[in-house]
Amino acid sequence: PDLRVFAFAADNVQLLSRLGVWPAIAQARAWPYRRMQVWDAAGGEDLLFDADRFGRRELGYIVENGLLQDRLWAALPAAGVQLHCPARVEALEQDDDGVRLRLDDGRRLEAALAVAADGAESTLRQLAGIEVEKHDYHQRGVVDPAAGERAGVGKEILPRIPPRGR
């Protein structure tokens, strides 16, 4: 199972609302949180974010990765997005008039713009000749959304950054 979650701030929620997907996410499973305390297990400074400081009822919401993806995919057809799935880009041509893509199933697509949002090892990015620099920061985070409720402090999330290299 995919256990990843996102902590969405108010601006993120506004964007998802404008896209028309927030009501479906909130109705399914979005957990509000009022505080977020981040600490570094290696002894760095703690960070504390509190909704009261910003005059808000909640600081944001915790949303599961799978739920977010499901609701975003479901919203694409209503937004006029044409899906070409499953398919992979095999060739890219670009000039002043736009871009042309050839897919592995033989289809050809033309557009004013192609966005390389196909992952860390983006074929489209590579075909366009866009280089990247990669860095592994050797950091992971652990989020315990229930810790705040157990401690009697209300809805709080407590991410912990383990010591470097773990």
Q: Where on the chain are the PLM-derived regions?
A:
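Glycine-rich FAD cofactor-binding loop and adjacent beta-loop-alpha segment at the N-terminus
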Residues: 1-33
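Short glycine-enriched, charge-decorated loop/helix-capping segments at active-site entrances
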Residues: 1-7, 54-57, 131
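Conserved FAD-binding catalytic core of PHBH/FMO-like flavoproteins
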Residues: 16, 117-166
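Residue-level detector of short coil/turn "hinge" positions at structural boundaries
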Residues: 23-24, 83, 132
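Pocket-edge structural micro-motifs
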Residues: 10, 40, 51, 146, ...
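Conserved N-terminal helical subregion
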Residues: 29-127, 135-139
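A general structural signal for well-ordered alpha-helical segments in protein cores
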Residues: 9-13, 69, 139, 143
